[in-house]
Curated annotation (Swiss-Prot):
Enzyme class: oxidoreductase
Gene name of this polypeptide: astD
UniProt-recorded name of the protein: N-succinylglutamate 5-semialdehyde dehydrogenase
Highest classification ranks of the organism: Bacteria, Pseudomonadati, Pseudomonadota, Gammaproteobacteria, Pseudomonadales
Keyword annotations of the record: Arginine metabolism, NAD, Oxidoreductase
Database matches in HAMAP family: Aldedh_AstD
Protein purpose: Catalyzes the NAD-dependent reduction of succinylglutamate semialdehyde into succinylglutamate.
Organism, as annotated: Pseudomonas fluorescens (strain SBW25)
Amino acid sequence: MNSLYIAGSWLAGQGELFESRNPVTQHVLWAGNGATAEQVESAVQAARQAFPAWARRPLEERISVLETFAATLKNRADEIARCIGEETGKPLWESVTEVTSMANKIAISVQSYRERTGEKSGPLGDATAVLRHKPHGVVAVFGPYNFPGHLPNGHIVPALLAGNTVLFKPSELTPKVAELTVQCWIEAGLPAGVLNLLQGARETGIALAANPGIDGLFFTGSSRTGNHLHQQFSGRPDKILALEMGGNNPLVVDEVADVDAAVYTIIQSAFISAGQRCTCARRLLVPEGAWGDALLARLVAVSATIAVGAFDQQPAPFMGSVISLAAAKALMDAQELMLANGAVALLEMTQPQDQAALLTPGIIDVTGVTAREDEELFGPLLQVIRYADFAAAIAEANNTQYGLAAGLLSDSEARYQQFWLESRAGIVNWNKQLTGAASTAPFGGVGASGNHRASAYYAADYCAYPVASLETPSLVVPATLTPGVRLS
């Protein structure tokens, strides 16, 4: 199978054979070979050769290609949504919104690029001071599996807009979505070599990240892989490295008046996308006492009724599957370990079918566990921690190496202002689901959640660098010479 797209041609990979499966039926959706280090080098050379012509194209011409890509996404929206749903397991209603986000990213990127870059000039003595921006050259984009269309698109679009050429390495769990996305770029008229697709797993990723021919790398994925990349790029200030990683995100609940509103927001924060969003709530901080007991009882009762099913099931489920049987097993094992260490199951997560990666929501009280692991459990497993007072809640919220998202459900604006000020996170929400963020806002965290904000409004800052110039059309001897210099 021709699994790679290099220099405008579809080629068979020469590396390890791998496949993607529908996580519910286990039906094979895609199979092919990954790219070898030699094929990665060929793709880097193709991107390097394509770079000058693409960078010299007028901005409006590049924008035209991007807008045609957006139109192609809209024309093929049903096909793309179904592809995302069957490969990730997320319900169709959610896949449809992902395709919409992909198309909307074009206008957002164009607006931010115009505002953050462009050309500025002013007089400076007998010359003109000019500030312009230039693309970096060849950049790599590593995509995740949870939003295999939208998230890599958030880096590919601004990179191409700025005049860079791109090497796209998608998750090995979602190769079919990546292939379809590249087909849409081809249909939009993107020139050969400007975007190259490198399918593959760990070996392909290592070869691409280590290739000296790339000028930068944009990564979205696990903290473990991101940390490896950071170590690999250590001592390389000539390379751009932007990392968007995970989080052990806290959602603090105050004693609010509308309990059902709190319950609904918690469910949207913890269990949407089967808990496979990097901003999902992992830790639910609930006050001690009768009010907290009542909230948890209501949360458990409602969560137990959440519909879980296949991506195309009708009526549509709220939750689809996790990405794979291996992911499901890891989550079940994590729950078992928590319970063995003294946690209490308020609602035990289950796997109804052994050969389907469908999991029901789990709510585990870990308040009494003395040695809690500070890790991102990427699935529908919510840990409850009871707190004595608001100061203790904030301290517990910050008790993590991560710092991606944090949220507060409270009727008190003063408490939110305190929470916002003292929280260590890149996204802080008040009375809204933790997974909600404006698509125009820069996305990212602090600590082990990553570095930089190479997306949305700030994307242009990482795709083009400023060049300062002093310019004058004529070379003349100044009226006054510097002391100690004579021309006669």
